[in-house]
Amino acid sequence: MIIAVDGMGGDFAPYAVVEGIIEAVKEQDINIIITGKKELIEAELKKYEYEREKIRILDTREVITTSESPVMALRRKKDSSLVKALQLVKEGKADAAISAGSTGALMSGATLIVGRIKGIERVALAPMIPGKNGAFMIIDAGANVDCKPHYLLQFSLMGKIYFENVLKIKEPSIGLVNIGTEEEKGNELTKNTYKLLKDMDFNFVGNVEPREATNGDVNILVCDGFVGNTILKTYEGVSLNLIHMIKEEIMKSTTSKLAGVFLKPVFKKIKSRLDYSEYGGSAFLGCKGICVKAHGSSNGKAFKNAIKQAVICYDNKVIDKIKFEIEKIYNREE
């Protein structure tokens, strides 16, 4: 398997990217093409011992930043590390692309350069989120602000295939994010989506309120990108603020500081459970090729796990299975 990695994407590129790649090639039977500024990437690679034939560099001179218009940047910066990584997938020279760069640019590039699977209306961003009772998926988490019911139906199908093949969970539970659990609750989108999902051969558990969403009791939370992104960012903000408040309270007195010493192992375990790097990245589902968005602040561990995630998708033929299931739906409708 060949994986194209955007060597210039992310807050800590290229050193965190290279660190993750080095660890990944030790553990996986893969080859890596790093796209980016050759001199910077080579300087990082020199710090490590590795099998030279497993990693090569495709020199690029441009970088797409998060402040740029995604579509305009894709058009203007043809020699950017992100565009070149996606082009390698399109041309069949790589089996997957990974980037921690601009989410908007990667989403647009995955759609415009790699392309959508025939029958898929919209590509969806599907991050795995740590929950109280296990990790869960939000789909869509920001790629599509305005949706139609059949988009959400397709999101559910793609999430189901991902869970069954990557996470090895059979018949994952699917919930529709809504303001109430009753079938008649919500707007026109959620009401009509509910009707579609309950008629499918899914483990559909009905509507799920946001306050229950983060428990992890439901494997896949389906919603439009506006709702999904709002849940995701609220969850991140609350988690960070809660940790900050606990630290503040611990430092207020000698007694609480002493208690903090004894509770340190507990806090470490909680931090580990909330660690996004364990899950690698967020898959863009619906593309003709494997595209994974790593977190912007990804460290080496996160990049290594994002690569591992891409390998599992490839080995389990996730793209082919999405194609097959979409064809089945359309054939049934005909």
From Swiss-Prot:
Pfam families named in the record: FA_synthesis
Subcellular compartments: Cytoplasm
Catalytic activity: a fatty acyl-[ACP] + phosphate = an acyl phosphate + holo-[ACP]
Coarse class of the protein's main subcellular location: cytoplasm
Enzyme Commission number(s): 2.3.1.274
UniProt keyword terms in alphabetical order: Cytoplasm, Lipid biosynthesis, Lipid metabolism, Phospholipid biosynthesis, Phospholipid metabolism, Transferase
Any GO BP annotation: phospholipid biosynthetic process
CC per GO annotation: cytoplasm
This protein's pathway: Lipid metabolism; phospholipid metabolism
Subunit structure: Homodimer. Probably interacts with PlsY.
Similarity-based family: Belongs to the PlsX family.
NCBIfam families in alphabetical order: plsX
Name of the featured protein: Phosphate acyltransferase
Species, as recorded: Clostridium kluyveri (strain ATCC 8527 / DSM 555 / NBRC 12016 / NCIMB 10680 / K1)
Gene name tied to this protein: plsX
